[in-house]
């Protein structure tokens, strides 16, 4: 089963993206470098629950 998780910018905190992840419990949260529209540059985005 899939669960929905959001990705938030580590600099400004805005939630820009959503992901469908497997429901298997993971120890670490997903970290991806994506473009932030608020900051106007590529920044690290971390999974929010």
Swiss-Prot record:
Pfam families, per database record: Ribosomal_L33
Keyword hit for Membrane: no
Gene Ontology cellular component list: cytoplasm; ribonucleoprotein complex; ribosome
InterPro entries: Ribosomal_bL33, Ribosomal_bL33_sf, Ribosomal_zn-bd
UniProt keywords, alphabetically: Ribonucleoprotein, Ribosomal protein
GO MF entry, a single one: structural constituent of ribosome
Keyword GTP-binding on entry: no
GO biological process, one term: translation
Top-level taxon of the source organism: Bacteria
Family: Belongs to the bacterial ribosomal protein bL33 family.
NCBIfam families recorded: PRK00504.1, rpmG_bact
Name of the protein: Large ribosomal subunit protein bL33B
Source organism (scientific name): Lactococcus lactis subsp. lactis (strain IL1403)
Species classification: Bacteria, Bacillati, Bacillota, Bacilli, Lactobacillales
């Amino acid at each position: 089963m899939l669960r929905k998780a959001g990705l938030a910018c580590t600099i400004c905190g805005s939630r820009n993206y959503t992901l469908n992840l497997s429901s298997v419990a993971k120890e670490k949260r997903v970290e991806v470098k994506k473009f932030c529209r608020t900051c106007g540059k590529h920044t690290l985005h971390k999974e929010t629950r």
